Amino acid sequence: MNELKIVFMGSPEFALTPLKMLLAEGYDICGVYTQPDRPAGRGRELCPPPVKTLALEHGLAVYQPQSLKKPEEQAFLKELKPDVIVVAAYGLILPQAVLDIPVYGVLNIHPSLLPRYRGATPVAATLLGGDEWAGVSLMKLEAGLDTGPVYSRSMVAIRPEDTTPILADKLAFIGGCMLLELLSQIPSLPEPKVQDNTQASYFGMVTKEMGLINWQTSAVEIERRVRAFFPWPGVFTTFNQKTLKILEAKPRNLGLGLKPSEVRVYEQSRVMVGSASGELEIIRLQLEGKAGCSAADFVRGQRNFDGVNLGV
């Protein structure tokens, strides 16, 4: 058992890998903070965050405060006497009183190359931006939104098939490795480097409305949204007054002369849709009330698809 006492704060799948890596290294996780259970699914039953499930499987103490701004919550956290707090997509703001508790500060795994893409959804922002590289920044948390000084950064090339969950998994592993390397240097931590705020950009929460396709944008932009907003909120349009989700797509430049939103069944089984620039080839899609399927299967079941305009 490593004698360093760690409080871990995280909620979604992204936080699972760093927590697993800390456990595998034998660190003393004296408490796990995660968001409260939320209603989910059609039945709106309360569902625990993924981190809570993992923590309980390992017999760890789990805490789910609505906020850490209350003095009593801060006093309780202080009683845990953490040497360091590790944050990975926790989702709650940490006030200065909390940041001051651990001996070696609060370390945050942020999945972007800070100061680029500060905010709540940096992985989706990276894909939307069309960047060639994604990355992780291991930073010392301060009161500002992802403004703290950075201990280290690591980069990974973005592949054409990367969606938000695929890329997030890669970055979570990289971030976990970076975290273990930094923790091994305690008590002699290096001096983190201040961010260049003039280069900062922000991206907030993703909303359902962001998934609605604007066919007046380019095929390249729409395809980026398909990958960035998978699996939620998804990217969608309408067909025959029903929601049509685009699950997988590729931008093309075939010179078909299609107007934005106009569908062309190409080579009998391929589906092309016009945009402001280029065609969007739909690879997989899902009509409201149906299972997802390939474009070829969809065309076989929708004989009137060729020539329609989507979203009208």
UniProtKB/Swiss-Prot annotation:
HAMAP family: Formyl_trans
Protein name: Methionyl-tRNA formyltransferase
Keywords, in A-Z order: Protein biosynthesis, Transferase
Organism: Dehalococcoides mccartyi (strain CBDB1)
CDD domains reported in the protein's UniProt record: FMT_core_Met-tRNA-FMT_N, Met_tRNA_FMT_C
This protein's encoding gene: fmt
Family the UniProt entry places it in: Belongs to the Fmt family.
EC number: 2.1.2.9
GO molecular function, one term: methionyl-tRNA formyltransferase activity
Reactions catalysed: L-methionyl-tRNA(fMet) + (6R)-10-formyltetrahydrofolate = N-formyl-L-methionyl-tRNA(fMet) + (6S)-5,6,7,8-tetrahydrofolate + H(+)
Gene3D superfamilies to which the protein is assigned, alphabetical: 3.40.50.12230
Task performed by this protein: Attaches a formyl group to the free amino group of methionyl-tRNA(fMet). The formyl group appears to play a dual role in the initiator identity of N-formylmethionyl-tRNA by promoting its recognition by IF2 and preventing the misappropriation of this tRNA by the elongation apparatus.
GO cellular component: cytosol
Pfam families linked: Formyl_trans_C, Formyl_trans_N
PANTHER family in the cross-refs: METHIONYL-TRNA FORMYLTRANSFERASE, METHIONYL-TRNA FORMYLTRANSFERASE, MITOCHONDRIAL
Annotated binding of (6S)-5,6,7,8-tetrahydrofolate, by residue: 112-115
